[in-house]
């Protein structure tokens, strides 16, 4: 069966409306029998998925199910959080975010399950950045300055811990802190705000193409990092793949196919970095040097090992949820997940020892 890539880009206003609808409307999912026919599946365009399609790893797995693969732009670079709307409306079968925003989506009413989690994050992934020419050299220099990032993302979770550790808390919905905070839900707009001086510093994934370009051109510098033993690195900064519960119950083998293809592709990319970077550059329209940076830099997040233990996943959510609530998280304070909900949020069938696990016992 022929495979093809479909690139779908949605206007920002439409994405915002979709997200609002995804949050406000209750889920109508109901139990379904496993392994229902699946003629096609929409997967997110990522560095590894474009390589997997080009090299045939996705086709190898999905041809066994008679399923055609479409790669779809999840819209996250246009509007952070867009993937939740696409997931809820059926435009995307599997979404990828860090575990904190995935948990916020769950708290906002998305009936989704985590089917894969990465091992712990890194202090290099989401540092605090300032312009090289700014004169700002440490977190202490940001007192009463303007910090901007995406609220429901690592651009908030990582710096919240960094600033708290430095005794300079960010503004939050409850009280004024010692650093002004602006929510900017677009990675390109965040970079533009930093370059134009509208904000003094930001925090985001260094491996994202627009941010990697600022690093490679020596326009920004790191002035603070997440504690290596902290809540972000060990818990909130883990990568998660999550799926609507109705879909995963109906098509568990489609999830297994995705996870198997990911493992094969990740191994191939690590062994063939230059060829992989060339494929990613061509398919996602970024410079080869930036594609290579996204693979090899310590901040990389798309090519991590999986966390086999479902208990570690459950404990990670419980740990970071409590920590952020204790430190002014207005979202999870009002809509936090119960222990029972967290237990069911992590679909143990896809972790080690589970019925659909890709991990060897």
What kind of region is each of these model predictions?
Residues 59-69, 227-234, 301-314:
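Short, solvent-exposed loop/beta-turn-alpha elements that line the ligand-binding surface or hinge
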Residues 321-361:
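Conserved C-terminal helix/tail region of periplasmic/extracytoplasmic solute-binding proteins
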Residues 35-184, 200, 206, 224:
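Short, glycine-/small- and polar/acidic-enriched structural segments
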Residues 28-33:
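Sec/Tat signal peptide C-region and signal peptidase I cleavage site
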Residues 13-26:
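Bacterial N-terminal signal peptides
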Residues 249-331:
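Secondary-structure end/capping motifs
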Residues 100, 178, 182, 186-283:
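Pocket-lining segment of extracytoplasmic ligand-binding domains
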Residues 2-15:
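Bacterial N-terminal signal peptides that target proteins for export
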